[in-house]
Regions:
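Start-transfer (signal-anchor) and selected internal transmembrane alpha helices
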Residues: 1-79
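Helix-to-loop transition at the C-terminal end of transmembrane segments
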Residues: 27-28, 75-95
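Hydrophobic core segments of transmembrane alpha-helices in multi-pass, intramembrane catalytic enzymes
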Residues: 38-43, 94-96, 122, 157-161, ...
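Short hydrophobic/aromatic helix or loop-helix immediately within or flanking a transmembrane segment
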Residues: 97, 112-144, 154-155
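Transmembrane-helix motifs of polytopic, lipid-linked glycan transferases
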Residues: 151-171, 209
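Short helix- or helix-capping micro-motifs
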Residues: 180-188
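Short acidic/glycine- and proline-prone juxtamembrane loop motifs at membrane-interface regions
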Residues: 189-203
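Membrane-interface transmembrane helices that cradle and orient dolichyl/undecaprenyl
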Residues: 210-227
Length: 228
């Protein structure tokens, strides 16, 4: 069992490094050497923290976490704009339809929403958001809508990472919560998906909130007994 766990850790580090190289490759195409530097440091940092977690004094864990958490939002937004892709698939369709409705008052893709009814609620929420933006910024256009939606999506992901830290803190304590939070803050798939204000980003926040509240209820034995 110990060998299996060690093998899984090695595979995790390798996959993490490969993914980080791909991401950094899109950001630092001007220098091949720069692509390899961040994965090495990040992998070494994760290995060091997980193997030497006892060096983390509990009184410093909160300070370290707040520093990492604050930097996480900056990196989320920076990654999202540096790795920005053209609007496509369902997210692009909802973004374009919401912008069209707010800017022109028309909706050409009615057949699409008749077929994919799950995107109707997402469209309503996006239209409402863009109407608020249009009210605050009368000259706002499609690019403004897209950029603001990216920032809001990053905030959703950032809050979800914060909830993961709170969940770990509730279950394991400050020290392990700090490690779990830093690992969540370094989870690159979250960075790659943060630019899409689609069902998954607010859904992840709602899921983590529900999980946190469920743990709070479970630990509150008095309320738990009343509930059942």
């Amino acid at each position: 069992m110990h060998h299996v766990e060690k093998l899984c850790n090695i595979l995790y580090v390798l996959l993490f490094g490969i993914l980080l190289i791909v991401v950094m490759g899109s950001m630092f195409t001007w220098s091949f050497r720069m692509v390899w530097i961040p994965p090495i440091f990040v992998a070494l940092f994760i290995i060091y923290i997980t193997k030497k977690k006892r060096i983390l004094k509990e009184e410093w864990c909160s300070v370290l976490w707040y520093i990492v958490y604050g930097a996480c939002l900056v990196f989320l937004i920076a990654f999202s704009f540096l790795c920005e892709v053209a609007p496509s698939w369902d997210w692009g369709q909802v973004l374009e339809s919401a912008s069209e409705y707010v800017l022109k008052g028309t909706l050409d893709a009615k057949e699409y929403y008749a077929r994919y009814t799950n995107n109707q609620l997402c469209l309503i929420c996006m239209v409402t958001l863009f109407q608020w933006i249009r009210f605050a910024l009368p000259d706002a256009n499609f690019v403004d809508f897209q950029e603001i939606s990216i920032v809001i999506s990053c905030i959703f992901v950032w809050l979800s990472i914060g909830m993961i830290y709170l969940i770990a803190k509730k279950v394991w304590g400050k020290r392990r919560a700090c490690i779990a939070g830093m690992l969540a803050a370094g989870c690159l798939p979250l960075y790659m998906y943060a630019q899409f204000l689609y069902t998954d980003t607010p859904g992840m926040l709602l899921l983590t909130i529900q999980l946190y509240l469920g743990i709070c209820i479970y630990k509150s034995h008095r309320f738990y007994r009343k509930l059942w």
